[in-house]
């Protein structure tokens, strides 16, 4: 059995299939891990979700910010934005099956056998693996709760609070957890977020740095696979960290990692 991890899909199905063909992926015996942002911006968001649903027995996904945005739009909490390519999903006859499956996915996945963690944006420097999994579980529980889900989706958007505090409660608490796992790029050593800067490492605001570069990061030395930050183009210069968002939807490439061997495969993508 081989385990492969792939960066942000964002509704780009053909590059994914190209990569799976390159490695002769067999869903009957192999496993596919995805770093989230499965949909949006690319031309095949519906077809991508349907394909993933068809191989869900061989799939491990974590949720990204675009996936959560889809859930918010589907629940009439948020409106479609310019550039969104989610309408086909919303109008699809099988939308409920697809969306119910989507909200069962995790924010953070840890493979104990391989000692490697999968997350969309990253793990804040002040959290250990145990704390990250515990905080992620708080949001995952709400996503699966029909009664609590709308309130969470309604309060999910926003950049404040910019820093975790154990005394936070309610949707405010869930928002900062979600922002860490699905939107983070730059932060301070104590986990204060800057969510406005989206360019490369050199664009860090004064006092901020990439989440993975803080010397006292609790998970330093542990393996993490993440996406979200296309401007890194796969290069974060940190041992054991694999940045897999290489900007497919922006005309870059889609990247696949053999989790066990470390081998990388790329498929170039047309700009959408």
From Swiss-Prot:
Gene (UniProt): apaH
Instruction: List the InterPro entries.
Output: ApaH, Calcineurin-like_PHP_ApaH, Metallo-depent_PP-like
Which Gene3D superfamilies has this protein been placed in?
3.60.21.10
What is the purpose of this protein? Hydrolyzes diadenosine 5',5'''-P1,P4-tetraphosphate to yield ADP.
Keyword Amino-acid biosynthesis tagged: no
The family annotation for this protein states: Belongs to the Ap4A hydrolase family.
Q: What is its EC number?
A: 3.6.1.41
What reaction does this enzyme carry out catalytically? P(1),P(4)-bis(5'-adenosyl) tetraphosphate + H2O = 2 ADP + 2 H(+)
Q: Which terms are listed as keywords in the entry?
A: Hydrolase
Would the keyword Membrane be found if you checked this record's keyword annotation? Answer: no
| One MF annotation (Gene Ontology) recorded for this entry | bis(5'-nucleosyl)-tetraphosphatase (symmetrical) activity
Recorded protein name is Bis(5'-nucleosyl)-tetraphosphatase, symmetrical
